[in-house]
Every structure is written in C-alpha cells, then in structure tokens.
Amino acid sequence: MKLKNQLTFVFIASLSGFITLSVSNDTIKATIKASAASQTLRILNWEDYIYVPESDEDEPSIIDQFKDDYFERTGQRIDVVYDTYSTNEEMYSTLTLGSNNYDLVAPSDYMIERLIRENKIETIDKSAIPNYLAYASPFLQDLYEKHGWDVYAAGYMWGTLGILYNKEVTDAIDMTTWKVLWDNKYQKEISVKDSLREGYFIGLAYVQNEALEALKVEYEDGLLTAVDYNEAISNLLNDTSDETIAKVKVALDKLKGNIYGTEVDQGKNDMIKGTVSMNTAWSGDAVYAIYEAADAGHDVLRYSLPLEGSNIWYDGFVMPKGANKDLAQAFINFVSDPKVAALNTNYIGYTSFIAGDSVLENINSYEGVVETPTEDTYELDLTYFFEGTLDTMDIADAVLYIEPDYVGGRLTTQYPSADEIIRSAVMRDFGDANQKVIDMWAEFKATDGQLWMYIVAGATIALLVTYALYSFITKNLSSRRRRYALLARKK
C-alpha cells in the first residue's frame, strides 16, 4: 500500500510536470508567434519623404511607430520593407520591370493617371482609411474626386513649383514672373531643375506669358470664374502641340546662356551656400533651404509663386495589382493621423494632405506668425484647407497673420493661398507627345560646353586605353625576348 501510494505520487508528480512543461512550451510558442512577423508590408516611396529620427532622443521613425501601433491593435508583429526612388519614371520601371512586389507606392498626379489607364493599381476601400476621410483636407479630397483619382489613390503630400531666391541680392518684385529666369541682370546666378517636366513647364510659362497675363486680367475683371480661369491656365500650361514644343525649345536654348546650370538635388544646397541666388525649386526643397540657411544665421532665402501661373502637384499612395491591401490601407490610415502628419511635415518640409488640430497647432507656432494683426501683417486664410477637419479648434484659427519679413518663408511656402492655387496648374501626362518632349529636353541638355566635356573625356579614355594596351604589348614582347635569350644561352 505504501508502495502504491508512492507510485501514485510519482505518477501524479510526473503528470504535473508534464502538464507544466506542456503549458510552458505552449506559452513559449505563443510568445514566439506573437513576436515573429506574420506579414511584410513592402513600400516604395520617394527619397527623403518620411520622418526618421536623427538621434536617440528623437521619436521613433514613422515606420517603427506604425509597426508598434499595428501590434497593439491586432496582436500581430509585421515587417516593413521600405525602398526609395528619385523619379516617377524610375518608380514606373521598378513596378513594371522589377521582380519586387510592392504593396504601396507614392507616384505623382500624372503617373497616377497613367497607372489607372494601364490598369496597374488596385481600388481603395475607403472604409479602411477612416483617418484619411476625417482629416485629409476636403479641398484636396474634392480635387482627387474631380480627377477620378480617389477610387485608386489616397493623397500623401502636395506642393508647388516656384522660385527660391536670395532676398539680399535680388529684387523681390522680379520674382513675381517666370521671365526673370531669362533676365540677363541675373546671368549665371540661376540654376534650374534637371527635370524634363519641370524644364518644359518653365519654358511653357515663358512662351505662353502674354496669354497667361491676358487671362489674369480677365479673371480680375470678373470676366472669368475661378473654375474657368484655372481650366484655361491648365490648358496653356499643358500644351504639347508641335508648334508649342518648337517654341519652348527656342526659349530654353535662350535660357541656356543665362543660367549657372541644371541640378537634380544640389540646388537647395547651392542656395544655402550662396553659389547661386535663384533656383527653380519644389516647395519642400525650398522649405529645407529656407530653414537651414536661417539656422546657420543667414535668414535670406524666400520662395515665390509667379503671378502668371505656376505648377501644383499631388503625390498619393496607390496599391499595385496583387498588393496586400489590408496592410497597405492600415499604413495609409496611420500616416493620416494629424499628429503623425505634423511630425512628417516638420521633418521633410513638404505639406501633408492631412489637416486637423495637430497640424493647425503646429503651423501656428511657425516663425513670423503673430496673434494680433497690424497694418503691416500679411493675412493667410487657410480655411479652405482646414474646414471640416477640426475637432476642438475654431476654424477662425486657420486665418493666420504673418510679419512682412516672413512672407515667402516656411509657412507661405508650405501652404499657398487660395488665390495662388487658382492660378496653378496640374501637369498632365504628355501622352503621345512624350517622346517629342524627351527629345527636345535632351537637345537642351546637350550644351556646347557639355559636348566639349564629353569629347575631352572620350579622348582621355581612348588615350588611357591605348597607353595600357601599348604597355601590355611592350611588356609581353620584352618578356618573350628575355625567355628567348635564356633559352639561347642554355643551348
């Protein structure tokens, strides 16, 4: 009996240990499962287009914040693969020719149109992006709907193309027209974007200047509605007829002799260093340059949108065919939170589609913004952007007053006025004229100076190759002669 009791005890103890071990193993497996990534979100975005920390004291990156937020809401760990590109065309090639299957990309307006036309992207389930519906500016949502982009895309960033200038060495009044780029008063002090579309645009603005000025007068005289005015400007600034392309080529050839050069990404740094005094710039790059120059003690850079008309652009998130829609839409919803949007805008310089209290509070803290207007302050009415998105703040808070010296600074660069938007055009896809514009731009880029550099470089390479071959042959002949001499001695 005693033995039986002992055996029973041993059995129960063993069973207890087995159960304990089983429970422990199950717990470990569950923990491992929870910590291991169950899915991977693959994002392809523009370079320098999302917040990342610069020190250990900074907030975590938006990518890391999203991963943590997703885990808190679902209990699932995810991975994020984040790749970048520098042009829409590079992105398009990656999507169509590459082997990577991305879930989310952020093309510009004209490229969104192309991807829709070619049936390369998925539709968006708007019920999955409540933050976007609640906080994306209704003005921008309406614009997406007008173009038919809203079915496929959710806006991410938007901005303009204008003139970044040094107010200490240029006249601000000159910056109100694109014609200043051709003014020999600023010869060799100007850099322009090494970009086919932006290059063609400034050429168009120069060629169409008289027609654009005439439209402006008609609008100001009440002969055109805002909608009709914007449509007329858009048609002029999207003209790709053979006659217009030829005129733009002549204009750009003339511009060639007046500029310091073209640049891809160096323009903002050249402005900060004072290498040039004027640069055709995207608004986000202008914000970066303005801020960095001021931070270095030289608050001399400002940004202008020419009065005859400018370019306005919109980048949006789309999901390529076969994307993980649930994960992609979860990310869109996360970055559409106003707090995340404010963090993003402060870091990259570009303007988020997202409005809301956090964003409005953020820009009210910008330099040059004052609470009480005076005779000299500039009124910037942003109710068009924030209306319908504020939870606690009053819409009257979206009317900001700026000290005169800060007009053209960070705030007015990031947030153009309603009047500036009316006279700005979205650039469309060039369509069948694309190759003609490409050829025209290539001819513009092939300046005499560049051709001479290519000739010199080619001749130098040819000489080096010839010398290397000569040295190789001479060395081998000498070696052979030595071997023959040794053999002759042995004989």
Task: For each feature predicted by the language model, list its residue ranges.
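Surface-exposed intrinsically disordered loops and tails
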Residues: 81, 134, 138-145, 217-237, ...
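Extracytoplasmic/periplasmic substrate-binding proteins
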Residues: 67, 257-322
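Conserved C-terminal helix/tail region of periplasmic/extracytoplasmic solute-binding proteins
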Residues: 388-490
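Sec-dependent N-terminal signal peptides of Gram-positive bacterial secreted proteins and lipoproteins
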Residues: 2-26, 461-471
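Mature extracytoplasmic/periplasmic domains
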Residues: 315, 320-413, 417, 464-467, ...
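Sec-dependent signal peptide cleavage junction
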Residues: 20-37, 472-476
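Extracytoplasmic ligand-binding site segments that recognize negatively charged/polar headgroups
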Residues: 46-60, 108-275, 289
